[in-house]
């Protein structure tokens, strides 16, 4: 009887052990399933993260390429800007030089014009001859004031071809040999000699030709009185 009870106790204990083992195994399987699910999710997340990283790397490569192109474009524009700035500075300097040169030429031209106007005024006073400078250089037009022996004043108009050397010399001799303006002529020539000029006055007996060396003296000077500025002295 005692042995039977002992045997029943052993079976009960054995049953409890088996039950505990099955329970532990079930619990382990449940844990394994849970771990497997978690592992699957982690693995899936890792794959997603890897794909996202690859996409970002591709996007970064594209952005890096765009950035490189932009940097190259900026360098080209910067180089172009420097070249344009240098060219602009050269142009400004050239314009400044041209303005200075133009101002100098304008000043010299104005001074020369004033000198010519003074010369023309002196010639008018010395010769009593008034020239229309607007007809130069094609023609020599004007009027000469001549005092006759009886004291009367006559106005003698003239119109000569600018290339007519004989006519210009004839006009020169006519003006130069006028007795009423001889003192003015002497004063004008004296002033020119003092200033370093070398005027040539052909004599009344000379008959200069168109090819004569005298053809470049006073007639040429008359034509060169220019005749770019208006005459301030009315005839």
Curated annotation (Swiss-Prot):
Signal peptide start and end residues: none
GO biological process, one term: meiotic spindle organization
Protein's cellular compartments: Nucleus; Chromosome, Centromere, Kinetochore
Location of the region described as Disordered in the Swiss-Prot/TrEMBL record: 193-216
GO cellular component terms, A-Z: Ndc80 complex; nucleus
UniProt function note: Acts as a component of the essential kinetochore-associated Ndc80 complex, which is required for chromosome segregation and spindle checkpoint activity during meiosis and mitosis. Required for kinetochore integrity and the organization of stable microtubule binding sites in the outer plate of the kinetochore. Participates in SAC signaling that responds specifically to disruptions in spindle microtubule dynamics. The NDC80 complex synergistically enhances the affinity of the SKA1 complex for microtubules and may allow the NDC80 complex to track depolymerizing microtubules.
Keywords from the UniProt entry: Cell cycle, Cell division, Centromere, Chromosome, Coiled coil, Kinetochore, Meiosis, Mitosis, Nucleus
Coiled-coil region: 44-106
Name of the protein this chain belongs to: Kinetochore protein Spc25
Keyword Nucleus in annotation: yes
Species for this entry: Drosophila pseudoobscura pseudoobscura
Gene designation per UniProt: Spc25
Quaternary structure note: Component of the Ndc80 complex, which is composed of Ndc80, Nuf2 and Spc25.
The family this protein is said to belong to: Belongs to the SPC25 family.
Transmembrane intervals: none
